[in-house]
Amino acid sequence: MASKFFEIHGVLPPVITPFTKEGKVDFEAFRKNIEKWNDTGVAGYLVLGSNGETPYLEEEDKLELIRIAAQHKAPGKLLMAGTGLENTQATIRLTQKAAEAGA
């Protein structure tokens, strides 16, 4: 059986979540940020880290950010997504959805 583990190496910066003046997630600005990071030497990206606004986002916004990062990251770049929530079952569900979205 093949191992499901892989070696993580290099720099994986936390990617900020930009907002519009109206307080909505700015998905277009987020996409542009991912594309700018593609031109750097980073090994990948950490989306929805634990030190930002993640706890205050709607689940669908979180999943859309993951989908955008997955669709626009350069080939070979790793995508990690924060999925920790207040209880275990909710964390498991969000983690499964994040994997389906490309993380």
What kind of region is each of these model predictions?
Residues 2-13, 17-103:
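Active-site beta->alpha loop and helix N-cap motifs at the rims of alpha/beta catalytic domains
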